[in-house]
């Protein structure tokens, strides 16, 4: 589907779930430099078919894609990139930080699982609940064939195909090496999962997230606020505008979440797991109690709670103590 002149959005379905889609974007070149593909979808037959059909519908050819840019290395954005490289010989570009965690995330996965398990234990998850929280994400790795990038991007780099010229904006938070692509002349931006139309992107603490991912994320949002943008092309959902208003709403959400955490701490020391149990969570547009969440959503709720606690500690509103191997938090005000 053409969303702007020379820019086509292709919805890539998740394996076995056609309603969960990732937006890939094809950026046309009119002078023979080759098209740019931004994000690829999962490494599945359904994803490949959807991509091929979307390219055909745009009257383009897959073999004319010469550059694949990945906004971040989560499976739904990065998984198919290796196969695309094989098919059309495209150059793969990923931010340096995400490029450097491909190996531990996808090839040395058992070591990462051990680190996640220890992190969840330290933050109060009972031993009998650990297996389901860990297993909730293992299926995703089946749909990623790790691909080594040809180019490791940095903040401020330029990507061009002769028709479009993008500035690479490093926007950590959702992933430590997440990037957005800003087309200054045409005033549009591809935001990956950094800014979405009506969903607050997941920002959780984990062994690969960096020390304070929510602080990084908020700084990245403020970085985008300064841009002149007419159209936002996100990694999920529809194209939209009013970037400043959307950022304001996301920031309000995180302020509300911090207030909810502070309320939960007023009656004493708690682990992140205990805090997550006391906070309402939004799932599919509705408020859901922690006990009713899926295993995957519970894990995200816990890691998001840790991320907010890390930020509250930086703001000197929360203190942290270790007690018998558990990480406990206490409100300062």
Map each language-model feature to its residues.
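Histidine-centered divalent metal-coordination motifs
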Residues: 71-77, 95, 174, 178, ...
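Short, contiguous alpha-helical
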Residues: 86, 171, 313
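Residue-level signal for inorganic ion chemistry
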Residues: 6, 236, 261, 312
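Active-site HxH/HxHxD metal-binding segment of metal-dependent hydrolases
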Residues: 42-48, 56-160, 187
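Conserved beta-strand hairpin/beta-sheet module of binuclear metal-dependent hydrolase folds
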Residues: 1-58, 90, 181-197
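Metallo-beta-lactamase
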Residues: 35-37, 42-45, 139-148, 164-258
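C-terminal regulatory/interaction regions
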Residues: 263-333
């Amino acid at each position: 589907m053409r969303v702007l002149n020379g820019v086509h959005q292709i919805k890539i379905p998740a394996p076995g779930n056609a309603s969960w889609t990732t937006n890939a974007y094809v950026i046309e070149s009119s002078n023979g430099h080759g098209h740019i593909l931004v994000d690829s979808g999962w490494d599945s037959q359904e994803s490949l078919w959807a991509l091929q059909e979307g390219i055909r519908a745009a009257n383009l050819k897959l073999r004319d894609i010469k550059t694949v840019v990945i906004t971040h290395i989560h499976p739904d954005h990065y998984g198919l990139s290796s196969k695309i490289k094989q098919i059309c010989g495209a150059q793969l570009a990923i931010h340096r930080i995400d490029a450097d965690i491909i190996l531990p995330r996808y090839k040395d996965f058992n070591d990462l699982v051990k680190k996640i398990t220890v992190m969840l234990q330290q933050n109060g998850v009972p031993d009998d609940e650990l297996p389901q929280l860990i297993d909730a994400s293992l299926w995703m790795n089946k749909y990623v064939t790790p691909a080594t990038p040809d180019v490791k991007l940095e903040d401020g780099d330029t990507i061009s195909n002769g028709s479009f010229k993008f500035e690479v904006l490093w926007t950590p938070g959702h992933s430590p090496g997440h990037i957005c692509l800003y087309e200054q002349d045409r005033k549009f931006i591809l935001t990956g999962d950094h800014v979405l139309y009506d969903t607050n992107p997941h920002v959780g603490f984990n062994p690969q997230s960096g020390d304070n991912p929510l602080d990084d994320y908020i700084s990245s949002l403020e970085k985008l606020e300064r841009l002149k943008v007419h159209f936002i092309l996100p990694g999920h959902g529809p194209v939209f505008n009013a970037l400043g208003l959307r950022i304001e709403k996301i920031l309000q959400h995180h302020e509300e979440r911090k207030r909810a955490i502070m309320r939960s701490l007023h009656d004493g020391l708690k682990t992140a797991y205990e805090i997550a149990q006391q906070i309402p969570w939004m799932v599919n547009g509705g408020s859901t109690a922690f006990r009713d969440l899926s295993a995957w959503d519970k894990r995200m709720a816990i890691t998001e709670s840790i991320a907010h606690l890390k930020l509250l500690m930086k703001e000197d509103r929360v203190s942290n103590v270790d007690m018998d191997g558990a990480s406990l938090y206490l409100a300062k005000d």
